[in-house]
Amino acid sequence: MLYPLSILTSEKNVFNEDVYSVNVPGADGYFEVLAHHATVIALLQPGKLTIINKDHQKLYFGITTGFIEVSHNSATIIADAIESVQEIDVERAKQSYERAKMRLESPDKHVDKERAKRSLNRAKNRIKLFLEIHPQVSFIPLKALLI
């Protein structure tokens, strides 16, 4: 059974369609929302968001943080940042990873280490999702970043 799903950021409406399900990275682990799901508001952590749309196709997104609200047989996701896996620029993600790693290793006391950790985790998530969705691509150096 289908239900409406909306995905929003502060900048745009990313997705607004009827879906069969959405699988999200909750703060306590992944969970799936189907039609007639119980009412819930949950925090989301960085990870992969998977949608099964009305054509039974799987759509994959990388999400940073946000929350999901499920009520009255509909779901809304508010995300700090989200992008379709097809939009991931893996070279840019690799550069972000390397910049964040340099900031974390910097002896400079003025470097915001928490911000650098978040940047590093976002870059790792983007690389991991890219490799997961494109298994035919062999990026040994990228896989090494995930260790």
Curated annotation (Swiss-Prot):
The keyword Ion transport applies. It is found in: Cell inner membrane. Coiled coil: none annotated. Keywords: ATP synthesis, Cell inner membrane, Cell membrane, CF(1), Hydrogen ion transport, Ion transport, Membrane, Transport. It is a peripheral membrane protein. One of its GO terms (cellular component) is plasma membrane. The keyword Transmembrane does not apply. InterPro entries: ATP_synth_F1_dsu/esu, ATP_synth_F1_dsu/esu_N, ATP_synth_F1_esu_C, ATPsynth_dsu/esu_N. Gene3D superfamilies: ATP synthase delta/epsilon subunit, C-terminal domain (1.20.5.440), F0F1 ATP synthase delta/epsilon subunit, N-terminal (2.60.15.10). It comes from the Bacteria. One of its GO terms (molecular function) is proton-transporting ATP synthase activity, rotational mechanism. Its main location: membrane. It holds the Pfam family ATP-synt_DE_N. PANTHER family: ATP SYNTHASE DELTA/EPSILON CHAIN, ATP SYNTHASE EPSILON CHAIN, CHLOROPLASTIC. NCBIfam families: ATP_synt_epsi. Produces ATP from ADP in the presence of a proton gradient across the membrane. F-type ATPases have 2 components, CF(1) - the catalytic core - and CF(0) - the membrane proton channel. CF(1) has five subunits: alpha(3), beta(3), gamma(1), delta(1), epsilon(1). CF(0) has three main subunits: a, b and c. Belongs to the ATPase epsilon chain family. This is ATP synthase epsilon chain. The gene is atpC.
